[in-house]
Amino acid sequence: MALWGGRFTQAADQRFKQFNDSLRFDYRLAEQDIVGSVAWSKALVTVGVLTADEQRQLEEALNVLLEEVRANPQQILQSDAEDIHSWVEGKLIDKVGQLGKKLHTGRSRNDQVATDLKLWCKETVRELLTANRQLQSALVETAQANQDAVMPGYTHLQRAQPVTFAHWCLAYVEMLARDESRLQDTLKRLDVSPLGCGALAGTAYEIDREQLAGWLGFTSATRNSLDSVSDRDHVLELLSDAAIGMVHLSRFAEDLIFFNSGEAGFVELSDRVTSGSSLMPQKKNPDALELIRGKCGRVQGALTGMMMTLKGLPLAYNKDMQEDKEGLFDALDTWLDCLHMAALVLDGIQVKRPRCQDAAQQGYANATELADYLVAKGVPFREAHHIVGEAVVEAIRQGKPLEALPLADLQKFSRVIGDDVYPILSLQSCLDKRAAKGGVSPQQVAQAIDDARARLAL
């Protein structure tokens, strides 16, 4: 049943109907549409449109429909209804007859869908926050177990300075904490109810919109009806949150793909998150991580697409805004799936400490320590930098690490170098010296783990 047929003398072309209908994706708003309708029925009692008995009948029928939807949401897709609003209204009329036709009094699909989508977004944000914190917790637990796993840190994908696997884990905890904060900020801004704003100019019934917002669990009602039915900032914000969050997960995946490679060999991924080759029997491919990395692009695309859709729209509602849902649903589903999969990857990961240690001892990752040693001896840093560069060239020529060069060879580059240089060049010394807040020293890493555990209530 179309909700707008009286104005028309011809039926819609079937091709247009298929093009126009949105039930195939907005069926996901069924529960929110029913919950919003229950609240609206209560508001109609306050302005005399419904009696208390009529409202009770409507609410009982809507609650029965809600249970039916929860038991079998796929039933909705068997309908020929235009959208989820017309499906719910049609089912309600089937249950209570003509009384069901009174429910839409004073309400437009414009404020109705805006309300439904905000309710869905609120619920989904809570799911994302839970999954985000679960992944943070998994990273903290992995860090706790690998505080002594020394490995090379990289810049330009070249070995730079020694770090620990724990410090690497904690870097992603920080990224995820920012993702969490962004979601919480987004939730604050979307937590206002547009219901009661009508098509664009407000409802003609003196409904207490603040009370109505409270019934639906919103903190308040929106302030301007024209903005309320046009607003999709929360869609853009959530897509932006997802895009940034997926960039973090993609970088996480890329790091672990490299760490798992034969060239690095720092970690071994569980059989539960890898697959084999149909031709090469020796292969163990990091498919879970590659899919996380690959899915990042579709989320970025959803954000870009929605921004382009909205940029040229005049106020208030336009049918273009129907395009807000498919990209949003897919992007947030994808982000949620990837958060869960990243946690599963960590659940079975094995860090190969000896290989990590060997790699950290190669590539002259202690060169900065020698420069700092010279600075402590009174050599200006820029000069010390040049001296160490020459020493590295000599070490490469001899095929030795810096700490294996004889003192006499080191003193060719600076007479201030003494026997006390060798303890400074050890990996442990490199770590211990990074003791400022946020550094890689064992004390700082342990403190960061404690702080994260306290914040996450682990």
From Swiss-Prot:
The record's top EC class is lyase
Q: Where in the cell is it found?
A: Cytoplasm
Task: State the reactions this protein catalyses.
Answer: 2-(N(omega)-L-arginino)succinate = fumarate + L-arginine
- Which GO BP annotation is one of this protein's? arginine biosynthetic process via ornithine
> Keywords for this entry?
Amino-acid biosynthesis, Arginine biosynthesis, Cytoplasm, Lyase
> One cellular component GO annotation, for this chain's record?
cytosol
Q: Which PROSITE patterns match?
A: FUMARATE_LYASES
Cross-referenced Pfam families = ASL_C2 (PF14698), Lyase_1 (PF00206)
> Molecular function terms in GO for this entry?
argininosuccinate lyase activity
Tell me the route in metabolism or biology where this protein functions. Answer: Amino-acid biosynthesis; L-arginine biosynthesis; L-arginine from L-ornithine and carbamoyl phosphate: step 3/3
Domain of life assignment: Bacteria
Q: What EC number is given for this enzyme?
A: 4.3.2.1
**Similarity field:** Belongs to the lyase 1 family. Argininosuccinate lyase subfamily.
Full protein name: Argininosuccinate lyase
Lineage in the entry?
Bacteria, Pseudomonadati, Pseudomonadota, Gammaproteobacteria, Enterobacterales
Encoding gene per record: argH
